[in-house]
């Protein structure tokens, strides 16, 4: 199965000039341009906030995009007021990360992989002139997550085709499309190709997530009075931050331990073994298939 996948990918890359061009930044200034898609106004920050901060620190251009407006993502409120609240939250969070913010005006829970939405995603990718695009896999517990993955797949390659969305110039090079990590097993589990240490930006990521209280401290759509009662109150900011830190230490430590062999591949056994917190990504078959030296250009954090 794995051999067949690699064979098909190799053949595709061999025959398609879009997939086999030398890799460099789309923009003339030489800085990378990265898009991280999430289904809701918090997903991109959770899944790629660490690596986004690392790129931003090096002067690269990062945008975190929510494909829906999050207007049903709370157990006590909904509609326009919630959408506006969540937009304000992610703007604060993204400013801390060093990224730009975009939230598409699609209702939470109603995202479909339609032609209309495919064209929206193509436009977002082209307008940003993206070198790297990250999104959910199309196998996830939430339909909005799944369809973000499908829409990314459907936009891959099409972003280079001149006569679709012809009012926006096509990209000269197909971006590297990546899936963010998850724990789902069917039809096949997440397979990490790249794992990045976020030890140096972990506190920065936590500070950003702290600015989205509707989702963590209040529980989002899955919250309740019982949930909120277990979280330190807003008056105890230090207690809240400690509660949040303990939660994310567990999550990002699990990610690092789960993908330790991939960290060792990119950092070497000694440095890889020392990584505490990580974010991992899988290369989508429908976009660029970079060689190892190309990945090091796109992820300029590896030794």
Regions found by a protein language model. Name each.
Residues 1-5:
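Positively charged n-region of N-terminal signal peptides that target proteins for export
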Residues 21-128, 134, 150, 158:
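Active-site rim/loop-helix segments in enzyme catalytic domains that contact anionic ligands
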Residues 138-140:
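Short glycine-rich anion-binding loops that position phosphate/pyrophosphate groups of nucleotides
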Residues 163-166, 171-173, 184-188, 194-303:
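C-terminal accessory domains and tails appended to enzymatic cores
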Residues 7-18:
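Bacterial N-terminal signal peptides
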Residues 152-166:
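Cysteine protease catalytic core and zymogen-processing segment of caspase-like enzymes
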Residues 145, 150, 154, 177-179, ...:
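Functional cores that coordinate and move charged inorganic groups
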């Amino acid at each position: 199965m794995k051999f067949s996948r690699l064979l098909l990918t190799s053949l595709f890359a061999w025959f398609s000039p879009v997939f086999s061009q030398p890799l460099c930044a789309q923009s003339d200034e030489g800085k990378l341009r990265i898009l991280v898609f999430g289904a809701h106004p918090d997903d991109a920050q959770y899944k790629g906030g660490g690596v986004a901060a690392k790129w931003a620190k090096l002067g690269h251009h990062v945008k975190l995009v929510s494909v829906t407006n999050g207007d049903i993502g709370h157990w006590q409120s909904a509609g326009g007021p919630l959408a506006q609240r969540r937009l304000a939250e992610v703007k604060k969070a993204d400013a801390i990360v060093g990224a730009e913010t975009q939230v598409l005006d699609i209702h939470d829970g109603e995202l479909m992989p339609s032609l209309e939405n495919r064209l929206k995603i193509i436009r977002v990718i082209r307008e940003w002139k993206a070198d790297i695009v990250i999104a959910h896999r199309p196998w996830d517990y939430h339909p909005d997550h799944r369809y973000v993955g499908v829409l990314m797949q459907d936009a891959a390659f099409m972003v280079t085709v001149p006569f679709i969305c012809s009012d926006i110039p096509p990209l000269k090079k197909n971006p590297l499309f990546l899936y963010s990590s998850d724990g789902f097993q069917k039809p096949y589990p997440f397979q990490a190709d790249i794992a990045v240490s976020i030890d140096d930006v972990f506190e920065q990521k936590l500070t950003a997530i702290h600015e989205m209280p509707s989702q963590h401290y209040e529980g989002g759509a899955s919250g309740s009075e019982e949930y909120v009662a277990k979280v330190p109150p807003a008056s105890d900011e230090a207690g809240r931050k400690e509660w949040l830190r303990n939660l994310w230490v567990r999550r990002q430590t699990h990610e690092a331990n789960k993908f330790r062999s991939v960290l060792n591949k990119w950092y070497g056994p000694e440095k890889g073994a020392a990584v505490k917190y990580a974010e991992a990504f899988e290369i989508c078959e429908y976009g660029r298939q970079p060689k190892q030296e190309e990945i090091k250009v796109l992820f300029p954090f590896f030794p």
